[in-house]
């Protein structure tokens, strides 16, 4: 039995209800961390369909990750509208559209999706340069090619962009050398009749711009569009969105400028902040700042991180809807190993008191911080899993699966690897945990690298904010006074974000 309109709205706060009932676009929703963003968006879609304001078959919601799209579909299913509403990532939505229109516009078969772009980058590099080929170089070149594509920068434009913005090509290449690699990569794909994931979006844009029949066919299935995580939209994704819409203005965007943490990969909050100028007048412009996830102590800590920004006044100030919790713990350790041991011991104490290891997370700024944590957790006989940008990697002290399982069994841990999460801050986005331990809060780690100012520093501030707001019940923030390296011990300074 389908839920009634009023049942769909039941349990929403005033701001969430106002957003859910604003079914005519354009609508902007600024949703802070823990403010019930997905709940509000899915209720809005369900409410519009239940009241017959929208046709579910012409309704599409797009987001950035497979996990987020699956969560949206799951929630819509419980509201009896998932069968007809399309909830997908940008790339899966565009790929579906491309497959639908390809037979009508092209005689030959559709190109294959490149399964190993890294191999193509390596072949391209070897073909055009004598540069040393290693994993870091290949990874950096692949990332730069991706950045060019989502930033709508062609090989012909690259050198000019570098000169205008002082951008340095990766791995010590000159702009002209990178352009040669970029062109060779494109040629290699063409020779293989392959396209990469960014090409999918580029081709759909091109077809819609060059063929009005194609544009009309695609737009006929998108009368109402919802875009999640709009603060992370790239120029390429923005271009695709505008092609999907045409003259239609039934669009709702949802995002949070304070959670823009992928600028290095081409994302920008500009489209979110400039939405009213581009699509206005807006029918609704709503802020969701009631945090249902974190305690007041954690929320206040997060607010202080953002309030110290010297250049941004557009961040939402969160207000916790939870009862008072434990104060945020700030701990200073003597060394990285002492920090890892101390955090592992605290988690061991939580688990011994009845908490689940899966409710605990250790957040790091970079992957390199994670190995020592694995060792410390192993010594405490704690299960763990490591999350990098590419996803989950169940890990222990050995990379061999059988050895790893045998080791866990010998420690009395067992083969169930659903344990403590060790994650980079970037990879933790969209997740939440009862107990969060944020380590390495020193200058050079967060903020990362040499002292920076302006937007680079601001992105590091937002990273700190994202890390803090992953915590539900408790937050432990720490740093180590010294680090050990090839040159012996070196002193560290506490992070400017260590509040």
Region roles according to the model:
Residues 1-107, 216, 246, 300-303, ...:
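P-loop NTPase Walker
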Residues 2-4, 235-333, 437:
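Conserved RecA-like helicase ATPase core segment
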Residues 5, 10-21, 25-30, 60, ...:
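Conserved helicase NTPase motor core
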Residues 22-23, 84, 103-194, 285-287, ...:
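ATP-hydrolysis module of ASCE/P-loop NTPase motor domains
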Residues 29, 35-41, 281-284, 290-384, ...:
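Helicase P-loop NTPase motor core
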Residues 84-97, 116, 382-397:
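Conserved beta-strand -> loop -> alpha-helix junction used to position metal-binding or nucleic-acid-contacting
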Residues 87-92, 199, 203-204, 417-426:
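Conserved two-lobed SF2 helicase motor
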Residues 370-387, 393-499:
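Conserved helicase C-terminal RecA-like lobe
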